[in-house]
Amino acid sequence: MSVDTAKSDIQAEPSTGTLENKSSKTYSDSENNSTLDVSAQVLTLDNKSRILCIADVRGELSLINSLVEETNASCVIHTGDFGFFERSSLPSISERTLRHIVQFSPLIKKLPRSKNFDYYPSNPIGDLKNSIASHPDCLLSELPQFLSQEKKFSVPVYVVWGACEDVHVLEKFRSGEYSIPNLNIVDELHSYLLQIGDMKIRLLGLGGPYVPFKLFDNGDGKGTIAGGQGTMWTTILQMGELIETAKSLLDREEARIFITHHPIGREGVLSQLATACQADLTLSAGLHFRYGASYNEFCVNHSPEHYLQKLSAARAQFMEVYDTVKAEVEKMVTPEQHHLINNVVRLVSRMPDATNSYAMNNMLPGTAFKNLWNFNLLDASFGWTVFVVENGHVQVESKSHGFNLGYRRMASRRNENYASHIPRSTSENTGTYYYANNRLVESQAQFTKNREATATPTEEEQIEGYDQEHTDELGMSRANTTEESAETHEVIEEKSGPPAAEEEPISGVAEKPSPNEEEQPAIGGKEEVDVEEVTKGTGNLELGETTTEVTILEQENAANVTRSQAQEGRRTDMQKGNDREFRQYSGEQRYERCGFHITPCNSEEEARSYFKDGTDSLITNIQIRTSLNRYKSPQAPQNVNPTNYAYVFVENQNAVSKALGSIKVPEGVRVNIMRDDSYYRQNRGWYRNNRMEGHGTGMRTNRGRGRGGRMNRMQHPRPLQSGGSVNKQSAEPTTHG
């Protein structure tokens, strides 16, 4: 059993004659009391002609002529939302539909920006309708200009109506009241034939979107078409009439194109209807995509069974609606309409039934599973598709506006800009670090740049300034620290000996080196120092006095001790740990983060409200996080309630001290000073990635606990932690509100 059995109704009346000797056949529309001719209407084109396929011009009908000129097309196929509106359509359009039309109308977008055409609910619908009605041109569509022949189509245009159309305007075209040269409406009653060289292409169409619960509702429409309040939809009578039309015009020499507004791949009933019409290609609107799509069911279904399941679901949905309204519908329809409904019901009943396991296991998808090719078209403003027919070969050309992926260029700059979002400390540890020969080396260029950019000198810079000033008083360069220590030693040795008999300046007197100095290598180019320079600023005391000796020694010792502390302060915990053979962190660049950790906290505004007396101006960045971020599993553990907390960053540790006394939080809210020592920034298994990267770090891990037991623990102690200096973020007591 095959799904292709849906073609049996059409094959029951085969046609072997050519188009020229085929007799005309008519069907009556009982509601309109008119007879419609479905005989073939032929358009003869040259070989290698081009067929332009577009969708959704939305009333900008003149765009069709522009695209025809661009693509050098011989005819046009349009798949819905054509713009069948006139001025009299405005009062009957519902508010929701009118706002949708105004939002996407290309005619209104060309107008100067004005609140009169604002489609948001803040603009009253009455004002919006008055603005559209008072405009000199019909903003809903250019159709009135084509009806008056002020504008004309340059080539034949074949259209089906879409979702946003006026059903009353369509009925005027069907009754013959309205007519536009070169405009042909393809529907369930009207089919057209394209003769391109020796190739015949039959156009079959079905207008409106497929809405299952509206299949038996005609709305304000008369006859088989349905619509109301500015919208239209497909009915079961249209589908039944289309089956009759396809049956009456069957010709084995023709290639068939089935034109719909609703994408066929999304609805199993429409897919089955295309199979019943023996279509080779289908054209549908593309749901306003920026790229066109071409596919068959074999492309989008991983197996024939999956395709049959889609048909089965569509069958169940249709039959559920039909069984609900069947009794009421049979009382209202005429015998002709009942025949059309039975055509569709018989078509759907041949689709797979999920409740029949034998049929599902033994049914085949048919040849349409691979041979029926579907095209979803672009909106006319975003692109087009062109069929080039040459000697029976159908080629496809396509153009699309596409998506702008230029924002990807910024991805490479995100890491560079990341530093600008992280508050920098004013300490000297903010340079660029890299490792060479297991030693931490600081980039001098980056270090100098950061030092110059610092407006306020740090404590270390003040120390260096004092050293430089004091060394200038001694007449030495800072680089001669060894010479300075040696000369200080000489002065101490001299004063520890017998007192001088003569009080003469040391300048110009050759001193006898001490025995210790004789053993040391001589330093060339050493300048002699005047005692007056040494004693400058100390009250011009004499060398022989003990007070002078003590003062000089205290100053020198204080300078040396302070310099040693400053040099030791520059050494980070990572450097100290590196000297002790501890594995250094070689990941992303480190930044010392200064600020507070507030929990619970749900928003930036809430975090700023805790900073009183204007201290919120010290805040440079706020990050809101949740406590469930620590878990790797996407599902939150049970018995764990997520808690939002905030990281509040400030410029430096001085800003932390200023803001600390002005933080006022309610009861139940905790404020901690963030601790971001180098130790906590290293690649620790217990600190990063939930103990999954601890191998090789010397820490206890969850690896190696099998037959061999745990890995050997590290034999050296952990690196030293910060001593709590100003430039280091140390742990401080929690501040409670």
Swiss-Prot record:
Gene Ontology molecular function: catalytic activity
Region (Disordered) location: 1-32, 448-523, 559-579, 691-737
UniProt modified residues of type Phosphothreonine: 456, 458
Domain of life the protein comes from: Eukaryota
Biased composition (Basic and acidic residues): 486-496, 568-579
Keyword vocabulary terms for this entry: Phosphoprotein
SUPFAM superfamilies: Metallo-dependent phosphatases
Biased composition range(s): Polar residues: 13-32, 448-457, 722-737
Basic residues bias (residue ranges): 702-716
Cross-referenced PANTHER family: DUF2433 DOMAIN-CONTAINING PROTEIN, GLUTAMINASE A-RELATED
The protein's name in its UniProt record: Uncharacterized protein C16H5.12c
Lineage, top ranks: Eukaryota, Fungi, Dikarya, Ascomycota, Taphrinomycotina
